[in-house]
C-alpha cells in the first residue's frame, strides 16, 4: 500500500535519498508524509493541468514535477534518474503498458533502489472445503 511505501521511504535506509514517484496522481496527498518531501520527492505524471495543480496544492514543488506522457524507454528513465540524483524509484506493478520493465531495468543499470507496489491479489475460485462440498453435491 502507499502507506507502507511512505513508511519505507521514511526509514533510515531511504530517508536521505531523492525519490522518483511514478505511481500516478491518485496518491499525491500521501506524499506529504514523506520526510523532507519538498526537497526529496520528484513526481512524474501526465502533463494534465488538473493533475499538476493538485500536486502543487499538495505541496510538491513545481521544480519537482515532471509532466510527461509515456511510454518511457529504459534510457529515458535512466536520464531522469541521473538528472535529479534519484536514489529510489517507486512504481506500480503495471506490466508492459505501464513501462514496468523499463523502469526496473533503469534502476538496475543506475544502481538505485526500486520499490514496487504490487497489484492487489484477485481471489477467484473456491476453497478446498467448498470444492469438496460442490463435488459431493454432483455425486463425484
Which ranges hold each PLM region?
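Glycine/small-residue-rich loop that forms an oxyanion/phosphate-binding "nest" at active or ligand-binding sites
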Residues: 1-9
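Anionic-ligand binding region
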Residues: 18-65
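Short glycine-rich anion-binding loops that position phosphate/pyrophosphate groups of nucleotides
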Residues: 25-27, 94-96, 120
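Short, flexible loop segments at boundaries between secondary-structure elements
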Residues: 48-51, 113-125
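A C-terminal functional module that forms or caps the active site or interfaces directly
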Residues: 56-64, 68-79, 83-84, 88, ...
Amino acid at each position: 500500500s502507499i502507506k507502507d511505501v511512505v513508511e519505507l521511504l521514511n526509514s533510515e535506509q531511504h530517508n536521505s535519498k531523492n525519490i522518483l514517484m511514478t505511481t500516478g496522481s491518485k496518491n499525491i496527498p500521501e506524499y506529504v508524509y514523506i520526510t523532507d518531501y519538498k526537497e526529496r520527492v520528484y513526481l512524474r505524471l501526465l502533463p494534465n493541468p488538473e493533475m499538476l495543480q493538485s500536486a502543487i496544492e499538495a505541496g510538491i514543488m513545481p521544480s519537482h514535477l515532471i509532466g510527461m506522457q509515456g511510454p518511457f524507454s529504459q534510457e529515458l528513465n535512466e536520464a531522469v534518474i541521473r538528472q535529479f540524483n534519484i536514489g529510489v524509484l517507486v512504481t506500480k506493478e503495471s506490466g508492459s503498458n505501464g513501462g514496468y520493465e523499463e523502469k526496473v531495468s533503469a534502476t538496475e543499470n543506475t544502481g538505485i533502489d526500486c520499490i514496487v507496489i504490487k497489484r492487489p491479489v484477485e481471489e477467484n475460485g473456491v476453497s478446498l472445503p467448498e470444492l469438496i462440498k460442490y463435488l459431493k453435491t454432483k455425486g463425484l
